[in-house]
């Protein structure tokens, strides 16, 4: 059986690279609810948690957990966009060093959000649809706050959790699960990690002049978050433009004159392709146009958007 308790610690470090932890086997059955301990080790006594997701046992309706840490809130569809939610869903954590327990139902696409000093603002659009906090929309009410989140899915057979540092890094989040299978932990980076990342970005910018420093967001002279290149490009489309062009020239030249073999480690086995007419073609499998630097940073545009090809 899956553990009924999972510890999530918002530490005083900075975020880690994405780490996925399988907290139970797919074959095991879970209870209808899960208790989660939120352990505050940020050093701040004013930390809030918000929990969102799609309620699997309630028609996949949008779910927020109310401030008492137990009561579900299902926002109704409002008549206009940007409507404030109708319930207090900011869960106050205790002082640094203390633990707050909450209980959730089965949720898909779940997120546990943490913010320091002030609660986050979640708005509701017709549908209903939740409007999440944004790190790229400068008019977003949360843009000047220190916040972060981890992701999870808890269904009738499994709990999956993910530190999810894909879009930005700010507050570090560590995950620990205890159960029949033992204890599993995804620790995040050590204390000072955000400052380390931001310092490295500033140094790289000084080295190559490519604008990596634009990924560092500060407030009052302190580092607030470090954005992914993709989110930096959202704010400045010229950022890192052409960064991989020299390397792409070499790759496209090399495989125009010789084949490329790829072990897919899947049903296709090892496939062989070659560049012809500027396109990397794997006969009978799929073809790929040359990516831009933005495509490479995002991995979900240009040739990486391959929903129409087998690969």
Task: Report each predicted region and the residues it spans.
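N-terminal export signals
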Residues: 6-26
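Extracellular low-complexity, O-glycosylation-prone Ser/Thr/Pro/Gly-rich "stalks"
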Residues: 31-311
């Amino acid at each position: 059986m899956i553990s009924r308790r999972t510890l999530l610690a918002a530490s005083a470090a900075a975020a880690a690279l994405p780490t996925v932890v399988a907290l139970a086997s797919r074959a095991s059955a879970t209870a209808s609810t899960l208790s989660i301990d939120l352990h505050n080790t940020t050093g701040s006594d004013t930390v809030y948690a918000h929990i969102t997701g799609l309620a699997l046992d309630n028609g996949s309706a949008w779910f927020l957990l109310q401030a008492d840490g137990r009561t579900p809130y299902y926002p109704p569809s409002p008549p206009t966009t940007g409507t404030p939610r109708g319930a207090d869903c900011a869960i106050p954590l205790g002082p640094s060093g203390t633990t707050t327990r909450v209980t959730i139902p089965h949720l898909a696409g779940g997120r546990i959000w943490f913010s320091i000093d002030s609660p986050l603002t979640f708005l509701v659009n017709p549908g209903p649809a939740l409007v999440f906090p944004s790190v790229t929309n400068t008019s977003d009410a949360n843009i000047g706050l220190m916040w972060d989140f981890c992701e999870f899915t808890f269904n009738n057979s499994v709990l999956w959790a993910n530190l999810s540092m894909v879009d930005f890094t700010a507050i570090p989040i560590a995950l620990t699960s205890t159960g029949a299978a033992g204890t599993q932990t995804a620790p995040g980076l050590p204390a000072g990690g955000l400052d380390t990342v931001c310092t490295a970005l500033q140094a790289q910018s000084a080295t190559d002049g490519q604008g990596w420093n634009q990924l560092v967001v500060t407030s009052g002279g302190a580092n607030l978050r470090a954005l992914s290149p993709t989110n930096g490009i959202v704010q400045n489309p010229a950022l890192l433009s052409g960064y991989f062009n020299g390397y792409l020239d070499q790759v496209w030249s090399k495989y125009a004159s010789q084949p490329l073999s790829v072990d897919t480690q899947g049903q296709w086995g090892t496939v062989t392709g070659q560049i012809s007419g500027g396109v990397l073609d794997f006969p009978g499998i799929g073809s790929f146009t040359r990516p831009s630097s933005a495509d490479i940073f995002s991995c979900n545009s240009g040739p990486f958007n391959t929903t129409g090809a087998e690969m």
